[in-house]
């Protein structure tokens, strides 16, 4: 699913049954690579295998983590992360169409969609790079990462 700087989610795995390409920054790739390398199941084809088997992790794992963690409990749910990102995009003057494309939302009438078929990948890559910087700043402020985290080289997680 990952090739170079793009994660392609097949249509059958998407809510709206449409293929979705996600731009990946160097930092995002490094986090995915770290997750894969720290897994108990290094031979699994999944970045996030389950704890007890090499099959994929339970889809509710993040929800369960947030419910059990005292910091997040009653403060944030996974879907709230999408809301935070969307609000950040609005505050940073990201166009409506590009912001909605970042969330894999379908916008416009069936007629307008017949003519506008771009997934705005290049524009979304620029947004992801800006969001990446925001996330790294937040992580540094919370002392969750080193000050040099943004000097990470692009890792070799991608499969050509």
Where are these regions (language model features)?
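A short linear boundary/processing microfeature
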Residues: 15, 37-38, 105, 117, ...
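Flexible interdomain linker/hinge and immediately adjacent N-terminus
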Residues: 10-17, 49-52, 118
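Active-site-proximal structural scaffolding
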Residues: 2, 15-17, 25, 79-83, ...
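Acidic, low-complexity interaction regions
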Residues: 121-133, 141-160
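Conserved tyrosine-mediated DNA breakage-rejoining catalytic core shared by Y-recombinases
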Residues: 1-34, 107-110
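Short, polar N-cap/turn motifs at the start of nucleic acid-interacting alpha helices
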Residues: 1-6, 73-75, 94-116, 137-147, ...
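Short, basic (Lys/Arg/His-rich) helix/loop patches that form interaction surfaces
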Residues: 22, 30, 34-53, 60-101, ...
